[in-house]
Amino acid sequence: MPAVRIKICGITRVEDALAAAAAGADAIGLVFYAKSPRAVNIHRAREIVRALPPFVTSVGLFVNASRCELGEILDAVPLDLLQFHGDERAEDCEGHRRPYLKALRMKPGDDILARVADYPGAAGILLDTYVEGVPGGTGAAFDWSLVPAGLGKPLVLAGGLTANNVADAVARVQPYAVDVSGGVEASKGIKDAAKVRAFVDAVRSRGRDEA
């Protein structure tokens, strides 16, 4: 199995971004959703992205943002990848000069494969826990056995991941990448460097065990 990529989401401070990169994370996530306790403004986001070392991907997370709002942010912040967590249609996610991920919440009864097919231009699909009215960052895991085979796109696994369960999640789901936020925090929006290192080590050790 190829190395699983790791994204540390909900970064709000330069020092947390640098700690994530130093621990071996492949990407960091910046939340542009005002209702989130992990939201960042344009100035802070630009500061964080500019501080990143080479080969660490910067990801912007959006929830039903207008095209005007997206344009303003993308003109100011050199993001590499966009991640859409709301009710966006494919046409809302495209045309921003960046590849994108579409997050789908594992709502009971939903046909995930059919929903994936609605986003043919997506670079990947992120599967997250469904909690009514909450677009992400719930801190709760979902039943990984519900992940369907044959998504046809790189799968990013999110939802309630921690250093204690991520190796099991990787073994069972075999995702392209894992995405964590609350599972590596000291408090909302503030990362715990030791938890970040432990999370990355848990993912990497799983890969070493399989080598």
Curated annotation (Swiss-Prot):
Coiled coil residues, start to end: none
A GO MF label: phosphoribosylanthranilate isomerase activity
Alphabetically ordered keywords of this record: Amino-acid biosynthesis, Aromatic amino acid biosynthesis, Isomerase, Tryptophan biosynthesis
InterPro entries in UniProt: Aldolase_TIM (IPR013785), PRAI_dom (IPR001240), RibuloseP-bd_barrel (IPR011060), TrpF_fam (IPR044643)
Family matches, as Gene3D superfamilies: Aldolase class I
CDD domains attached to this UniProt entry: PRAI (cd00405)
Pathway: Amino-acid biosynthesis; L-tryptophan biosynthesis; L-tryptophan from chorismate: step 3/5
The EC number(s) this enzyme carries: 5.3.1.24
Domain of life: Bacteria
Uppermost EC category: isomerase
Catalytic activity field: N-(5-phospho-beta-D-ribosyl)anthranilate = 1-(2-carboxyphenylamino)-1-deoxy-D-ribulose 5-phosphate
BP GO annotations: L-tryptophan biosynthetic process
Family: Belongs to the TrpF family.
Protein's name in the database: N-(5'-phosphoribosyl)anthranilate isomerase
Annotated organism of origin: Pseudomonas paraeruginosa (strain DSM 24068 / PA7) (Pseudomonas aeruginosa (strain PA7))
Gene encoding the protein: trpF
